[in-house]
């Protein structure tokens, strides 16, 4: 789009061609038929690594790598999985993944599981809900909310988004808790497990205010 608007026609054609190829390859490469959602990555051995990533699927849908007709069943699966695993407290944000990341998919194993979610058990369960191993956060939660608005699922989008707005209003995505860890990453019971204190990515969901506004015009 930028190249086209600047009159760089050759660049625009190049990028459009590559975008088309990426779009055609993305679904067949990453959609996991066993779960009905997009995996996080495919390793060199061909194996899909799928931990029910909410942000991966949200980003892909938001940026048009998945058609709306294919996006709706993906979102249905993610919402159903959230219910199945018992995640309901959207005032804490949205977990980046809904099942534990296995130990074998981590590179470093130096910290206790409850610090950064790095597991010691092979199935990853001891690190689950901590930091980027299923911790609840507003970081990149925007894309799940945006994807729901984009395909016309207003009620579902609001169910996730409105509790987060209440937390933004009270400053609950910034600062530190009594344990010295910050509020930008929490376990599902609200315990703090972040370290930055003010994670700017956590404020992306506020962009969805414009999507909500569009639904009311």
Describe each PLM feature range.
Residues 1-9, 13-20, 27, 31-32, ...:
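Active-site core of glycosidic bond-cleaving carbohydrate-active enzymes
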